[in-house]
UniProtKB/Swiss-Prot annotation:
Residues binding Zn(2+), per UniProt: 139, 164, 168
Catalytic activity field: Zn(2+)(in) = Zn(2+)(out)
Compartment(s): Cell inner membrane
Any GO CC annotation of this UniProt entry: plasma membrane
Membrane topology reported for the UniProt record: Multi-pass membrane protein
TM ranges: 11-31, 40-60, 80-100, 125-145, 158-178, 187-207, 217-237, 249-269
Organism in which the protein naturally occurs: Stenotrophomonas maltophilia (strain K279a)
Residues that bind Fe(2+): 136, 139, 165, 168, 197
Protein name, entry field: Zinc transporter ZupT
A GO term for molecular function: metal ion binding
Origin: domain of life: Bacteria
Protein's gene: zupT
Length: 269
């Protein structure tokens, strides 16, 4: 079993908490501004998507393969790493099937804005909060274990997830605020959803701490890579395209990949 220094655990948990708290930033944008700039939102979503795809395929998947190679040998390690990646995709597909993540638009012409029924908005708020909270658990695991094993990978990943969490905070705060007309409730709902990330990280570490090995890290990193790539392709990039007026999606995607590439190079020096 691998021995993890306690200070590394606290650092990883703090990084995960910081990424999760970005949902609160999203709620503040709703409560203290007239309306988020859709083109800037499109760029930010695509930036996060590009960053997550790049770090998942260039670093996290490779760490899965390397961990399996240390446990079982190079050839078997590559096979297991690939299987773990595909397993991660399957896991998040199942989660997305049973608990769909609402892709709420911020357009004031949407039914949620036109609907006069307070009860309808309350249902929208509840379903949105539950769905996004459920999706935040695997993101918390991803940030925590990536930082635990390699801060040079975990920190950029946490940054990408934090950007991704800002529009999620918006998606929660909008229906809650319109349903309750209470800024505190809207802020609290977004904040609690983001706290699901460090909670998921703590639960994951508690369950796996007694069996941490090269093979365990191999499975965790492979699953994380699959989950992150699916989230980027299924949620972030389509949402960015919906809000874009021009080439913001492409520019954001390239900027996200480029920023992560440069940051990973700098972390190596």
């Amino acid at each position: 079993m691998l021995q993890i220094p306690p200070e590394n655990v606290w650092i990883a948990l703090a990084v995960t908490l910081a990424a999760g708290l970005a949902t609160a930033i999203g709620s503040l944008l709703v409560l203290f501004s007239r309306r988020p700039n859709p083109r800037l939102l499109a760029f930010g979503l695509a930036f996060a998507g590009g960053a997550m795809v790049y770090v998942s395929l260039s670093e996290i998947l490779n760490k899965s393969i390397a961990s399996f190679a240390l446990a079982y040998g190079e050839r078997t390690g590559f096979t297991y790493g690939t299987l773990a990646f595909l397993a991660g995709v399957i896991v998040i597909v199942l989660i997305d099937h049973f608990i769909p993540n609402p892709h709420d638009s911020l357009d004031k012409q949407d039914p949620a804005f036109r609907e006069n029924s307070r009860e309808y908005l309350k249902r929208v708020a509840l379903l949105t909060s539950v769905a996004i909270t459920a999706h935040n658990f695997p993101e918390g695991l991803a940030t925590f274990f990536a930082t635990l094993e390699s801060p040079s990978v975990g920190m950029p990943l946490a940054f990408a997830i934090a950007i991704h969490n800002i529009p999620e905070g918006i998606a929660i705060a909008v229906p809650v605020y319109f349903a309750t007309q209470n800024k505190f409730y809207a802020f609290s709902a977004s904040l609690l959803s983001g706290l699901a990330e460090p909670v998921g990280a703590a639960l994951g570490y508690w369950l796996l701490s007694g069996s941490l090995s090269h093979a365990t890290f191999g499975w965790v990193f492979g699953l994380i890579a699959g989950v992150m790539v699916f989230l980027a392709l299924d949620e972030l990039l389509p949402a960015a395209k919906r809000y874009a007026k021009g080439h913001e999606t492409v520019y954001g995607l390239v900027a996200g990949m480029g920023t992560l590439a440069i940051s990973l190079v700098l972390f190596k020096w």
